[in-house]
């Protein structure tokens, strides 16, 4: 079947925002007005189409980014719904990676919130073109102009209003379209499906002129001809203006800001028009780069004629279809039944069922093209971030980077049957979410779950109990400490064992020193003249690696260390890779002691938003948790406190904060860096773990 929509008519975009800014409601309305949903799902009734996992419907927050295809103005929209809670930023990173553009939704009562900043920074990292939608204009305290100021102050970006609200709060009637210079008002009886263009209300004419002038001036700066014409007194026509605004979005010169209330069904259709008019198609963004099987850089253009390349960006377990792998096709054509190679893992796969997803309804397809986002059923080897490609033209697309988990809990199944179910379930959950790790404690034999925060692990445990029916005891959350050396140390170690017959002999000299923070572990062999034969070097590395997972302070993983193998001795008969492994392990442990290893603890960036009355109590409490206050400012009538606090002191903080502020203060927390733990904390941890 030939392609039904030209690739320039595709819009692959995501909707990103702070939790509770109304992102899922906005997506729901988009699905309703594009004719995909017959009944509007309300988040607060737990019925939103995109939020299809049970846990999401109960908590009213979006956890997994569901991908949906819809159509508007002859264009094909592939929408990725992303979570706004900080514990799920991995989902956001992953979806931004495969999008061409994004709509950033703000709560116009709150302006730019902490998680908005996080997702905005992630958007900057992947250079995602964005437009902004100031939502909830019907709410008490809604302030469109504060949103504009916040974008400058908190995001350091240049916002340009292309709409203005008509009224606000209870009187929010509609909006002024500054491109057309017309008002738009909605018909409430039709659930906002019908709207009319009207003259701009008299009391807004001056304001509309002022903001239109700002918009036109910003736009014409991007084009010499338009600027020359403008300076001669000729305003750009509507088509030129749209072309220039589009150029601004694609280059990041400025960000168009729209407004509305998705909940009250106002402003959604113009938002869809803006997606079509201003967000890029797959051919408007730079072609994706990768490396071929020889390690050379190659480019894959968004074109059906190019060799096939697709990226797996999400894996889900579906009760009816089994494992579903969401993929973005960057180039070429994918047909069901064809063989592909997973170049990341060097495994062959056959494409079975191909599905187009609509939240959790699905449509079988036989063929998909460059620019499509498809769900593939039954892939055996694929993991998040893997590349699937043409076996004859192999490529590995850019890898995604996933953050290290900072919190862990032990889980013990209650019975043998639960043990078996747990194993299967954890393998599936770890495949779906790379920021969720599973390991076994070597000494206790316990299964350890690691994640990005308490909520992240709560939800995983919930899924284990509900979806996989695993009955288990859950331990208290533990902090993921690390260890590192603080000074250079040189150690020579000889391993000798003689017990009749062949003995064991190996001698190594190593130099261990701190590496730059974040640089991780680096090994270098400085051996010259065969003091340690080449075939034994892997044995040395194996020994060093075995110590990296369990340091000398309290048995936590060692980070940011450089190890050089500078000298050694071997014996023709008694030396072996195993002997060198044992020698290097002992040498490394001794060097870590000599190099004054210290305990590192995760430090979290905490932002508390509280009414003025509770500021003193909140700051006092943060100080008592070894927090360092970084600054305060006002947001509306609330006080915003920024602090760096050790994670080990933040457990159960949510309940404390609630009781301290009578439920009126909120906080967000995300991992910032590792820092050396004070001596008393280190001693306490050593007593507990060593």
UniProtKB/Swiss-Prot annotation:
It is found in: Cytoplasm. GTP binds at residues 17-24, 81-85, 135-138. The keyword Protein biosynthesis applies. The keyword Cytoplasm applies. Signal peptide: none annotated. InterPro entries: EFG_II, EFG_III, EFG_III/V, EFG_IV, EFG_V, EFG_V-like, EFTu-like_2, G_TR_CS. Pfam families: EFG_C, EFG_III, EFG_IV, GTP_EFTU, GTP_EFTU_D2. Transmembrane segments: none annotated. GO terms for biological process: ribosome disassembly. Residues 8-283 form the tr-type G domain. Gene3D superfamilies: 3.30.230.10, 3.30.70.240, Elongation Factor G (Translational Gtpase), domain 3, P-loop containing nucleotide triphosphate hydrolases, Translation factors. One of its GO terms (cellular component) is cytoplasm. Keywords: Cytoplasm, Elongation factor, GTP-binding, Nucleotide-binding, Protein biosynthesis. GO terms for molecular function: GTP binding; GTPase activity; guanosine tetraphosphate binding; translation elongation factor activity. Catalyzes the GTP-dependent ribosomal translocation step during translation elongation. During this step, the ribosome changes from the pre-translocational (PRE) to the post-translocational (POST) state as the newly formed A-site-bound peptidyl-tRNA and P-site-bound deacylated tRNA move to the P and E sites, respectively. Catalyzes the coordinated movement of the two tRNA molecules, the mRNA and conformational changes in the ribosome. Belongs to the TRAFAC class translation factor GTPase superfamily. Classic translation factor GTPase family. EF-G/EF-2 subfamily. This is Elongation factor G. It comes from Bradyrhizobium diazoefficiens (strain JCM 10833 / BCRC 13528 / IAM 13628 / NBRC 14792 / USDA 110). The lineage of its organism: Bacteria, Pseudomonadati, Pseudomonadota, Alphaproteobacteria, Hyphomicrobiales. The gene is fusA.
């Amino acid at each position: 079947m030939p392609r039904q929509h030209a690739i320039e008519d595709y819009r692959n975009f995501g909707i990103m925002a702070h939790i509770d800014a109304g992102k899922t409601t906005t997506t729901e309305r988009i699905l309703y007005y594009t004719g995909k949903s017959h009944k509007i799902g309300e988040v607060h009734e737990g019925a939103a189409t995109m939020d299809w996992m049970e846990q999401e419907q109960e908590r009213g927050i979006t956890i997994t980014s569901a991908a949906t295809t819809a159509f508007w103005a002859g264009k094909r929209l592939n929408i990725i719904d992303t979570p706004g809670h900080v514990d799920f930023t991995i989902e956001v990173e992953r979806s931004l990676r495969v999008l061409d553009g994004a709509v950033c939704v703000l709560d116009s009562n709150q302006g730019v919130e902490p998680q908005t900043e996080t997702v905005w920074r992630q958007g900057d990292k992947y250079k995602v073109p964005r437009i902004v939608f100031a939502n909830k204009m019907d709410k008490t305290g809604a302030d469109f102009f504060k949103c504009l100021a916040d974008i400058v102050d908190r995001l350091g970006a240049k916002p340009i209003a292309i709409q203005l609200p008509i009224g606000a709060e209870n009187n929010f009637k509609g909006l002024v379209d500054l491109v057309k210079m017309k008002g738009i008002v909605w018909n409430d009886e039709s659930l906002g499906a019908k709207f009319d263009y009207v003259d701009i209300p008299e009391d807004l004419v001056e304001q509309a002129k002022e903001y239109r002038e700002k918009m036109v001036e910003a736009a014409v700066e991007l084009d010499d001809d338009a600027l020359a014409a403008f300076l001669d007194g000729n305003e750009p026509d509507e088509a030129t203006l749209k072309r220039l605004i589009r150029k601004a979005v694609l280059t990041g010169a400025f960000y168009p800001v729209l407004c509305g209330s998705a909940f009250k069904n106002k402003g959604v259709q113009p938002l869809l028009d803006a997606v079509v008019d201003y967000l890029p198609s797959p051919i408007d963004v730079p072609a994706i780069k990768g490396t071929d099987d020889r390690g050379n850089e190659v480019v894959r253009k968004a074109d059906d004629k190019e060799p096939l390349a697709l990226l797996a960006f999400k894996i889900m377990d579906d009760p009816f279809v089994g494992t579903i792998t969401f993929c973005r096709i960057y180039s070429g054509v994918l047909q069901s039944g064809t063989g592909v190679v997973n170049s990341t893992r060097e495994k062959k796969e056959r494409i079975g069922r191909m599905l187009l997803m609509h939240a959790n309804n699905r449509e079988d397809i036989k063929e998909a093209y460059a620019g499509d986002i498809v769900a593939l059923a039954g892939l055996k080897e694929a993991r998040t971030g893997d590349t699937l490609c043409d076996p004859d033209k192999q490529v590995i697309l850019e890898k995604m980077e996933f953050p290290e988990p900072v919190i862990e809990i032990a889980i013990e199944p209650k019975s043998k049957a639960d043990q078996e179910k747990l194993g299967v379930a954890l393998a599936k959950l770890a495949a779906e979410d790379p920021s969720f790790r599973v390991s076994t404690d070597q000494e206790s034999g316990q299964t350890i779950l690691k994640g990005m925060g308490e909520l992240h692990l709560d939800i995983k445990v919930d899924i284990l109990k509900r979806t996989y029916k695993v009955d288990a005891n859950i331990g208290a959350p533990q902090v993921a400490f690390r260890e590192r050396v603080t000074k250079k140390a040189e150690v020579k170690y000889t391993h000798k064992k003689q017990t009749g017959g062949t003995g064991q002999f190996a001698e190594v000299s190593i130099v261990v020193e701190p590496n730059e923070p974040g640089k991780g572990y680096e090994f270098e062999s400085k051996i010259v003249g065969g003091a340690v034969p080449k075939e034994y070097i892997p044995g040395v590395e194996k020994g060093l690696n075995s110590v990296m997972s369990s340091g000398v302070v309290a048995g936590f993983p060692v980070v940011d260390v450089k190890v050089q193998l500078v000298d050694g001795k071997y014996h023709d008969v008694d030396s072996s890779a195993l002997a060198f492994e044992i020698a290097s392990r002992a040498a490394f442990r001794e060097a870590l002691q000599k190099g004054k290893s210290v305990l590192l603890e995760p430090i979290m960036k905490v932002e508390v938003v509280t009414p003025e009355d509770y500021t003193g109590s909140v700051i006092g409490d943060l100080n008592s948790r070894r927090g360092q206050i970084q600054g305060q400012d006002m947001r509306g009538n609330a006080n915003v406190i920024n602090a760096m606090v050790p994670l080990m002191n933040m457990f159960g903080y949510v309940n404390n904060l609630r009781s301290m502020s009578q439920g009126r203060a909120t906080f967000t927390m995300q991992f910032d860096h590792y820092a050396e733990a004070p001596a008393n904390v280190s001693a306490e941890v050593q007593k507990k773990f060593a």
